[in-house]
Amino acid sequence: MGQKIHPTGFRLGITQEHRSRWYADPKNYPDTLQEDHKIRQYVKATLANAGISQIRVERKAEQIDLEVRTARPGVVVGRGGAGIDSLRVGLQKLLGSNRQIRINVVEVTKVDTDAMLIGEYIAQQLEKRVSFRRVVRQAITRAQKAGVEGIKIQVSGRVNGAEIARTEVTREGSVPLHTLRANIDYAYCTAKTIYGILGIKIWVFKGEIIPGQEEIANAKVNQPKRRQQKRRQQYDDRSNEG
């Protein structure tokens, strides 16, 4: 039932990594989980125009490490790091504690292959009342030029202001939802139009990840090269030839 389950949760530990890394006592677990949710909501609301792809949270004792993956690192960092400082102060006020918060900004180099950034682009265009089919076709074309093996986009709601809500699905290439080793990037976002809210889902297939293949390739690269012994060239003795 590959279409019934969240593609990221289905592949955690196989091709996807956990986006929150910490351990907590059972009595503190709900509060810590809610803190993660508040942190992500605050960062996305504060940096709405920064093209946020992922926010990863890691906790160590009294320290919180945030990894913000963005398409516009300059907007997040700000002039002289002022953006990060204001974000850190805002998070400390939100959490109501003086815990140390470290923020690491990572740039997303391939914007056209990131599912969340593709979804945000489609949502922004739909909110500007651009034609649905034109926006989806542009997003698919850009993703294919960037080298993805397959992409699937689903838009649900009153598409183009229709009286009756419907679901439009567009797919190009291969998107194997049942294959666990398939590296599928999934995202969901909403577009708030004058006709109502549209739900946008994006699946991006970036190829298969075979366990051990990368390790074998790296071992071959790092293996020291043996020097080949040069063979002596044999010369014919032609000194007695007239």
Curated annotation (Swiss-Prot):
Family assignment from sequence similarity: Belongs to the universal ribosomal protein uS3 family.
NCBIfam families associated with the record: rpsC_bact (TIGR01009)
Protein name per the record: Small ribosomal subunit protein uS3
UniProt biased composition (Basic and acidic residues): 233-242
Alphabetized SUPFAM superfamilies for the sequence: Prokaryotic type KH domain (KH-domain type II), Ribosomal protein S3 C-terminal domain
Source organism: Trichodesmium erythraeum (strain IMS101)
Described function: Binds the lower part of the 30S subunit head. Binds mRNA in the 70S ribosome, positioning it for translation.
Domain KH type-2: 39-109
Metal-binding in keyword set: no
GO MF, one example: structural constituent of ribosome
GO CC, alphabetical: cytosolic small ribosomal subunit
Chain intervals with Basic residues compositional bias: 223-232
Subunit organization: Part of the 30S ribosomal subunit. Forms a tight complex with proteins S10 and S14.
